[in-house]
Structures are given as structure tokens and as C-alpha cells.
Amino acid sequence: MENMPPQSWILTCFCLLSSGTSAIFHKANYSRSYPCDEIRHNSLVIAECNHRQLHEVPQTIGKYVTNIDLSDNAITHITKESFQKLQNLTKIDLNHNAKQQHPNENKNGMNITEGALLSLRNLTVLLLEDNQLYTIPAGLPESLKELSLIQNNIFQVTKNNTFGLRNLERLYLGWNCYFKCNQTFKVEDGAFKNLIHLKVLSLSFNNLFYVPPKLPSSLRKLFLSNAKIMNITQEDFKGLENLTLLDLSGNCPRCYNAPFPCTPCKENSSIHIHPLAFQSLTQLLYLNLSSTSLRTIPSTWFENLSNLKELHLEFNYLVQEIASGAFLTKLPSLQILDLSFNFQYKEYLQFINISSNFSKLRSLKKLHLRGYVFRELKKKHFEHLQSLPNLATINLGINFIEKIDFKAFQNFSKLDVIYLSGNRIASVLDGTDYSSWRNRLRKPLSTDDDEFDPHVNFYHSTKPLIKPQCTAYGKALDLSLNNIFIIGKSQFEGFQDIACLNLSFNANTQVFNGTEFSSMPHIKYLDLTNNRLDFDDNNAFSDLHDLEVLDLSHNAHYFSIAGVTHRLGFIQNLINLRVLNLSHNGIYTLTEESELKSISLKELVFSGNRLDRLWNANDGKYWSIFKSLQNLIRLDLSYNNLQQIPNGAFLNLPQSLQELLISGNKLRFFNWTLLQYFPHLHLLDLSRNELYFLPNCLSKFAHSLETLLLSHNHFSHLPSGFLSEARNLVHLDLSFNTIKMINKSSLQTKMKTNLSILELHGNYFDCTCDISDFRSWLDENLNITIPKLVNVICSNPGDQKSKSIMSLDLTTCVSDTTAAVLFFLTFLTTSMVMLAALVHHLFYWDVWFIYHMCSAKLKGYRTSSTSQTFYDAYISYDTKDASVTDWVINELRYHLEESEDKSVLLCLEERDWDPGLPIIDNLMQSINQSKKTIFVLTKKYAKSWNFKTAFYLALQRLMDENMDVIIFILLEPVLQYSQYLRLRQRICKSSILQWPNNPKAENLFWQSLKNVVLTENDSRYDDLYIDSIRQY
């Protein structure tokens, strides 16, 4: 190290600095969980890696992770190395990774190496749905308890497939071979026999054609829906004494108006079930026989099913069975009975006929009778149900009922939900039935879903009939999608105890005057959405003293007509009203009153109106429209086409506000300073506007703010100090803006902050080295969650486009200090090298001469007299070139020394130098003791050190003695671009001789050479040169 040259020291320092910088940024790349979000929940450590466009299992996941969600990616290969570092895994979700929607990416589906998961000794749940697998993966760990292979291409199950899965409790193999499968789903005899702990088995939507034999006795739930099973024998379920759920729906289906590809059994026959097929299922709690084309229900099926609690018989042909109902006497524990859509083809019955045996269902809680299709319901038709002590829900939706006696629902001790949606119930005015007035504009009863959910039953929905927010208030009545376009005083007689009423989609055009609901005085939740209500009376709803929630949204019909009266003064009369929804009414003017008044209202939804017109009036009439809502906590002003908010209107908002929503408008400017007048504001939603600027210090104007939603705007940068004192802010959403760079100073706070969620996805960052400042902030604040971090991507430079900022390699970036040091070192090194090269090129001879002169002085040398010369010329030539040496000795020497006329004495190196003297001394002596110095030049010799030294010594005589002694003989064309040679040719052309190519000219050459040697050079100088010299 002590002898290391300076260049090596510089290179070493540069490498150390570079490696140190690389180490710093390399460490930063993995300090935050990426590309997955790791969440701790009690003892679980969950890695959320779904929807990340991953093509392989990330290797940056923490080793303590217990649950990993890798669903909805593009992972097609699972090897032994995929989960090798994750030995604590208990659950793996790999659903939807080889989707058929992307055949070019996943032509062969997912490939799982045999034994790839075998080392995961703690794994209990493995989900592999929708991955185009062709077989059950081999080599799965014995610890596995749940395996889901729904929606794959598995057509066969063998003993080998299930070998090693002795601890499996739940196996899902549904939807593998049904709609697009033209073969049989084969199950080897005894394939499930060794799964002695199996509790749940799903083989639904597979072309089975029979119940698999030798099922394990441990089974609790068996799903065999839509398996094309036509015959159930007495032996099929023997040995399954522990079964609590059996689903046989969709076998021999009723295909009339089926919303999916449907193939009925031959001649529309029903499934054949042996009378004693269920005899051994004594623990059965749930039985689904929906859409099996049943026409009769033998009582013998239920002989031993005394514990059955839920029975589904919808989509069959059971109108006659509903009338007789002999099997109902065998179901003492039944709580839920669904007989929906059992109507007969092309029959519109006058009445519903319910068997007296329904009265035997003493445990029944919910009765679904949708799609029976009848015209009229009278009180006597439900007399067999009124004695049921636990009946809480009656569902008569979509029956096309035209006339109904609401007294039929009286005398039910626990009835909470009456569902009559989708009928033709009409208005009753003064006892007159207007059922013939049909509304043809009702909302269509269709679904927008194009795909079927394999986890949801085809034939009945598990969604609540009525919104839980409504039923929470008490007894509920749903009359939506009917023909009640006018409500008479006697319309709801007998419903004094109703607390939740839904009258949406009835095309009601009524002007309420405060008498319509007098027979239902205890309503607390009233839904009147999607009607055509005319608000022309301030006494509307005055009969509803207990009303707390009123939904009047989507009643824009009369609000859009300028000449019609628009009064909302009724609000101040509702002294218990807490929530009012006036959204999507297009309100742009009000009659008489310019303010909404209420002392009880807590939440007002005013979205989808025209505040832009109300607030832009020149007189500011409606600026105080919300001022008198003294206790308002939440105000929704979204989608009001606002391009600006007048300061006067904003300052007239209730100061009690805690949540203010102004999203979906066209705001380009927002006056942040006005937020200081709302000391209780916790949530501000300004998303989906056209805002460009943020305040320099948010907390200066909104210190109480906890949630700030600013997504889908045009913010391009965050001001420095934006969050400097925002200690209460918890959630900041900046997603889908035009932010390209975030400085550390914008997010740093002067005090402890509560910020826990920062949303940044949808922006396009400039991923240059300047982003390292933001990356370091991310690494220093690991407690702040960045949702969808994998979607926080780069827009440029080009090689980083569409990559996440967390995958950005910053090892090539250095800090400012390091960059300055490296720049100084490299600049110094480069400058020194260039300076040394320049000095060497320009002053090498001078330095060399001065060095040797000084060295000679120090050694005692004295300048010798040069006045005495012994030779006429010293010959400098390439002694190593034999041809040149031969020419000099035999030609040059001969013609100059041995000529008869004026012989010349030459000094030759090989003949006249003193042996033992240094070369430089001999050279200097030869030049100084000769009148002339002749240089015999070849291309090789012109580049040699000997020539350059002799030339500089001869040139030195010109400087010391003012004697030009140099003569050139060019044996080859050399130094053609030499400035010195060109200048000499202009001044003294005769001192440069070229060996002639023509032998006849040699005599002239020798004569010219002899003349040059024997005469002074300056006597032959060009006259033009001499005249120019004399001028100075």
C-alpha cells in the first residue's frame, strides 16, 4: 500500500465510494414490503399480493408470513423454490392465475412441479381455482385441510390423486366439466374412501351422472348440484350418517327461461329419488332440491329428517304440492322453506292455494313464495300461516299480484319482513282499486352480470330482501316495483306497526299533503326513490312524526320543469329526521324559501343536483340554502356541476360539519383558507374535480382534518411543508393525479403524525435519481401504508416506463456529497493527465535540456570551446538498418571523402566515436566538432529517439552559436506534414536533398551535397526571408 502509485489510490477511492453508495441503495430497495402488502392481524401475518401482475412468486416476502394471497396474477409455474423461504405458511391463494381470457399468455395453464409444496409442513389451505389444471397436483403436504380446484379442466379423480391427503377436510372440485365439457367427469371407485377426515366435498357442475360410491362417513356437506344425476338410489347416501348439508339442485333442471345453458332430462322428467334415499341422513339440516323438475314430494323422503332446518324447492312444478303439502307434516324443525318459481306454464291463477299442513311448521321463520303467479291475495288465504309462532319473513315478490288485502298480514306475532316487490299492486283511493292502471315503465328485473359465481347458488340469492339499514328500525314492508302511483288514506290500513317502508319504482306522481301515511304513523325509514313526486305542499310527511330516514332520490321529473312549484319547506316539520337523501333530482330552483331548515338533520345527500345554477345567481339568493341546518354533520354535494364555489356560499355552510363531500364536480380552484371556519371537519372529499393547487401548509386552515380525498384531479406537485403540522391527518388520497415528483420536505412533519394511509397509485413519476429522496422517506416511514404500491409506477425515462418505483434500481445513483467528491477527484485526475500530456508535447525538449544542463553544472562540467572543428560533417543515420549503413559507407563516404576534387572529412559513428564514452557524450562531441550535421532519414529512423536527440543537439547550436548546421538527406518520403521541414524548405531549400529515383541524376545529387557541405547555409537563404528579417 505504501508503494501504491497515485493513480491506483484514486481508482481505489472511486471504487470504494461507488460500492458504498450501491450498498446504501441496495438496502433501501427491500426495507418496505414490495410488491406485496404485509398486514398483521392477531397471530397472522398476511401478505396481500393479489392483482399485482406478477409472473412468479416474489422472493422478497418476509419469512414470518402465514397467509399469502397471490390471486389474479399471471403466475403459471410453481417450483420447489417458489415457497422455499416461507416455511410458516398456513394458507396459499393462487386463484385466477391462468385465466382462459389470456390464452396467449397461459396456453397450457398452471404448471405445478411434483412436490413443489411438500416442504410446507404447516400448510392447511390451498386455493387453486380457475388455473386450467388438468389434474390434482401431486406431492401435496399431508398437513393440508382445505383444497379448492374449482373451475379447472380436471375430468378425472383417481386414488393416486388423493393419496397422501389423509388429513384433508374440505375438497372443492366443482365447475370442472359442465358447460363446455363433452365428456364424463370420472371418479374412480373409492377415490375418496381414504380421506377419513373429509367433511366438505363439492362436485357440483360436473358431468357425473351418478353419486360417487364409497364416500367417507366423515362427510358433513356434500354438493352435487348440476351434475346431470337422474337417479338417486337407496344406497347412494348410506354410511353418511354425519351429513348435515346435501345439495342436489339442478339435476334434471327446469329449463324454462333459465339464465344459463340448460339441458332438461328426457321428456322434461324429474329427478328420480328412491323413497328411502335419505333414510340414513338423520343429522341433515339443509336440503336443496331446487330445479329438479319435481312434481310431487313423497313424505317418505323426510321420515328420518326431523332435524331439517332449511329446505329449497324453488324452480320446480309444485303448485299442487303447495296445495296438498303432505310432506310438511314430517318437518317439525324446518325454519326456512323456499317454494319460489313453481308456477305452471301459461297459467295466471286467481288465488294462491296454501295447504293447511303449513300450520304444522311450528319452527318456520322464513317462507319464500316468489313466482307462484296469482292475481289476488285475501286474508283467508293466509289463515294457515297466522298460527305459526316464529314466522318472521314472508316473501311474495314477483307474483304479479294485482289486488291485495293488507289485513292478511295481521295477526302474525313475529312477522318482521313483508316482501311484495315486483307485483302489480295498485293504488286504493276511497275504497276504489286502481289495479287496472298498469305502469309499464318499471325497473327491469334483470342482472348485469355476464359471469356466474361458482360460490353462489344458482337458484336462490343469499342477499337480504330489504336493506339492513331499513330493517334495523323494525317491521318492514317492501312495495317497490308496483303500480302505487297515488297513495290513498286507506291504502295501508292494518299496518300501524310498520317502521320500514319501501315504495320505490312506483311512478308515483302525487303531491303529498300530510295525510297519506296517517295509518302508518310509526314509520322511521321511508324509501320513495325513483318516482315522480311533486313537492308542492309544505305539509308533506307531517303525519310521520317518528320519521328518521327519508330517501327522495331520483325524483327529478317535476324538478326539471321550470314552471312547476318546488317546495322543500316540509323538512322543518320533521322534528326527528336525521338522514335526508335528495340526490339526483336536478334541483336548480326552489319556490319561496331559499333555505332548508331543520334542527334534527344530521346527514344530507344533495348530490346530482344543480348547485352551479343555485349558487351562481347574481343576487346570491341561495348562498345560505344549508345555513339553517344547525346540527348537520355530513353534507354530500357531489356531482353538482360546480365550476366554482362562491366564498359567501361556502361560509354559509353549517359550522357543525364533520364530513363534506364535493367530489365529481368541475372545480378548478378551491379556497383552502375558508376551512378554518369549520373546526370540527374530519373528512373532506374533493376527488374527481379539476384542481391544480394545494396549500403550502394544510394544517394552517384545517387542523382537525383526518381524511382528505384528492384523487382524480390535476395536482402535479406537493408544496414544501404541505403536511408539516398536519398531526391529525390519517388518510390522504392523491391517486390518479399528474404528480411526477414528491420531495421529502412535502411529507415531513414537525411533530408526531397520525398519517397511516397514503394513496399514490395512478400517478406517473419521473424515475430519475431525484426520486431517491422520496424513496428514502418511504423507507423511514414504514408505519404508513401505501395501498397498491405496485401500481405507483414510472412514466420516464423510457427504460423505466410502467415499472413500479419500488423496483427502480438506484444503485447507479449517488448522494450530492459523494457526487461532489467523485467529481473533484475525476476532474483533478483528468486535468493533471491532460496538463502532463500538454507539457510533454510542448516543452519536453526544454525540460530535458534544462535538466541535463543543470545536472552537468552540478557535476562540474564546463562548456567546451566549439570554435575548433575537426570534421566537415557529422553523419547521423540508422546504424541498425543494414541497407542504410551500406549506403552511407560505400556511397556517401566514397563520393565525399574519396572524390578527387575537394574531398570532405566526415565523422561516422561506427568509425570515429571514442569507445567507452557514453552515447550522449560521443553524440554531442561529434556535432560540436563538425561544421555540418547531415541527417540521413528513413521512415523508421525519423521516429527513433537517436534522431530526435541528435536533431535537438544540432538545433541547439543555432540557438547558442547562431550557426545553421543542419542538412537533410531523404532516402524515403518522410515528415511530409512536419511544419519545421516545410518552413526550412521555404527558407533554405538547398539544405534538403532527396535521393533521386533516376540513376542518371545521382552525379548531380553528389555535387549538390558537396556544395551544401562546403558552404554556409545562411548564404543560401531565400532573399524574401532575409528582407523580412531586416525590417525588424
From Swiss-Prot:
<dbReference type="GO" id="GO:0071260">
    <property type="term" value="P:cellular response to mechanical stimulus"/>
</dbReference>
<dbReference type="InterPro" id="IPR000157">
    <property type="entry name" value="TIR_dom"/>
</dbReference>
<feature type="repeat" description="LRR 12">
    <location>
        <begin position="331"/>
        <end position="360"/>
    </location>
</feature>
<feature type="glycosylation site" description="N-linked (GlcNAc...) asparagine">
    <location>
        <position position="513"/>
    </location>
</feature>
<feature type="glycosylation site" description="N-linked (GlcNAc...) asparagine">
    <location>
        <position position="182"/>
    </location>
</feature>
<feature type="glycosylation site" description="N-linked (GlcNAc...) asparagine">
    <location>
        <position position="357"/>
    </location>
</feature>
<feature type="repeat" description="LRR 5">
    <location>
        <begin position="145"/>
        <end position="165"/>
    </location>
</feature>
<keyword id="KW-0675">Receptor</keyword>
<feature type="glycosylation site" description="N-linked (GlcNAc...) asparagine">
    <location>
        <position position="743"/>
    </location>
</feature>
<feature type="glycosylation site" description="N-linked (GlcNAc...) asparagine">
    <location>
        <position position="88"/>
    </location>
</feature>
<feature type="disulfide bond">
    <location>
        <begin position="470"/>
        <end position="500"/>
    </location>
</feature>
<dbReference type="Pfam" id="PF01582">
    <property type="entry name" value="TIR"/>
</dbReference>
<dbReference type="InterPro" id="IPR001611">
    <property type="entry name" value="Leu-rich_rpt"/>
</dbReference>
<feature type="repeat" description="LRR 8">
    <location>
        <begin position="220"/>
        <end position="239"/>
    </location>
</feature>
<feature type="repeat" description="LRR 25">
    <location>
        <begin position="727"/>
        <end position="749"/>
    </location>
</feature>
<feature type="glycosylation site" description="N-linked (GlcNAc...) asparagine">
    <location>
        <position position="242"/>
    </location>
</feature>
<feature type="repeat" description="LRR 17">
    <location>
        <begin position="520"/>
        <end position="543"/>
    </location>
</feature>
<dbReference type="InterPro" id="IPR035897">
    <property type="entry name" value="Toll_tir_struct_dom_sf"/>
</dbReference>
<feature type="glycosylation site" description="N-linked (GlcNAc...) asparagine">
    <location>
        <position position="783"/>
    </location>
</feature>
<feature type="signal peptide">
    <location>
        <begin position="1"/>
        <end position="23"/>
    </location>
</feature>
<feature type="glycosylation site" description="N-linked (GlcNAc...) asparagine">
    <location>
        <position position="353"/>
    </location>
</feature>
<feature type="repeat" description="LRR 24">
    <location>
        <begin position="702"/>
        <end position="725"/>
    </location>
</feature>
<keyword id="KW-0399">Innate immunity</keyword>
<feature type="glycosylation site" description="N-linked (GlcNAc...) asparagine">
    <location>
        <position position="231"/>
    </location>
</feature>
<keyword id="KW-0325">Glycoprotein</keyword>
<feature type="repeat" description="LRR 20">
    <location>
        <begin position="600"/>
        <end position="621"/>
    </location>
</feature>
<feature type="repeat" description="LRR 9">
    <location>
        <begin position="240"/>
        <end position="267"/>
    </location>
</feature>
<feature type="repeat" description="LRR 4">
    <location>
        <begin position="120"/>
        <end position="143"/>
    </location>
</feature>
<dbReference type="GO" id="GO:0003677">
    <property type="term" value="F:DNA binding"/>
</dbReference>
<feature type="glycosylation site" description="N-linked (GlcNAc...) asparagine">
    <location>
        <position position="122"/>
    </location>
</feature>
<feature type="topological domain" description="Extracellular">
    <location>
        <begin position="24"/>
        <end position="818"/>
    </location>
</feature>
<dbReference type="GO" id="GO:0032755">
    <property type="term" value="P:positive regulation of interleukin-6 production"/>
</dbReference>
<keyword id="KW-1133">Transmembrane helix</keyword>
<feature type="glycosylation site" description="N-linked (GlcNAc...) asparagine">
    <location>
        <position position="111"/>
    </location>
</feature>
<feature type="glycosylation site" description="N-linked (GlcNAc...) asparagine">
    <location>
        <position position="160"/>
    </location>
</feature>
<feature type="disulfide bond">
    <location>
        <begin position="252"/>
        <end position="265"/>
    </location>
</feature>
<feature type="repeat" description="LRR 23">
    <location>
        <begin position="678"/>
        <end position="701"/>
    </location>
</feature>
<feature type="repeat" description="LRR 26">
    <location>
        <begin position="752"/>
        <end position="776"/>
    </location>
</feature>
<keyword id="KW-0433">Leucine-rich repeat</keyword>
<comment type="similarity">
    <text>Belongs to the Toll-like receptor family.</text>
</comment>
<feature type="repeat" description="LRR 10">
    <location>
        <begin position="281"/>
        <end position="304"/>
    </location>
</feature>
<feature type="glycosylation site" description="N-linked (GlcNAc...) asparagine">
    <location>
        <position position="502"/>
    </location>
</feature>
